[in-house]
A protein has these predicted regions:
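...captures the hydrophobic TM-helix bundle architecture rather than a specific catalytic motif
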Residues: 1-177
Length: 177
């Protein structure tokens, strides 16, 4: 849970960090998924031995609703993939973006939050957590794809991604009800 919160906390401070460090902010932000990757690697022994790590937070106890995260073998493997690619992508962004890019400050926060939402999606252990992280990835992918609103192709692609993931989320919601 702390790894997820670290992603969202970093996303909250990322715009200010980008205004201060410019594109070098990506190098600092890459430390968050890299730390998650390192933590996942440290869990290799437990996970390969068949032990799961579970975090269960009561959300609405009277309705039996909780927010559950689990790290089993599949989640561990996908978590390594998500955090590893997330860290590498953030490192690449430090060289990809131009120093004077006006959308840099917005992109840093959204990308870091997206990386956290993807990790949450991988670790989700019940439908409530899965649905929350699915919807977060929907919103963040829309803003990432459309990060340059001046280009009509970006706006069109972002809208298409929003529609596809929203319909997927609606299908998931209908399936759970």
């Amino acid at each position: 849970l702390l790894l997820l919160l670290a992603h969202f906390a970093a996303a909250a401070v990322a715009p200010g960090l980008a205004k201060f460090l410019n594109r070098r902010a990506f190098l600092v932000l890459a430390l968050v998924p890299a730390a998650a990757f390192a933590w996942l690697l440290a869990q290799t022994g437990d996970v390969t031995a068949g032990r799961s790590i579970v975090e269960d937070i009561a959300w609405v106890p009277s309705l039996g609703m909780d927010f559950a995260l689990r790290l089993g073998t599949l989640q561990w493997l996908l978590g390594l993939l998500v955090t590893g690619v997330g860290a590498l992508a953030l490192l690449y962004c430090a060289w990809y973006f131009k120093p004077d890019d006006p959308s840099l400050w917005r992109f840093t926060g959204v990308f870091t939050a997206f990386a956290g939402a993807m990790l949450g999606l991988v670790l989700a252990d019940n439908l409530l957590a899965l649905y929350i992280f699915w919807e977060l990835t929907t919103v963040f992918s829309y803003t990432l794809i459309g990060h340059n609103p001046v280009r009509s192709a970006n706006r069109r692609s972002a809208t298409q991604a929003l529609l596809v993931t929203t319909f997927g989320g609606l299908a998931m919601l209908i399936g759970t009800v």
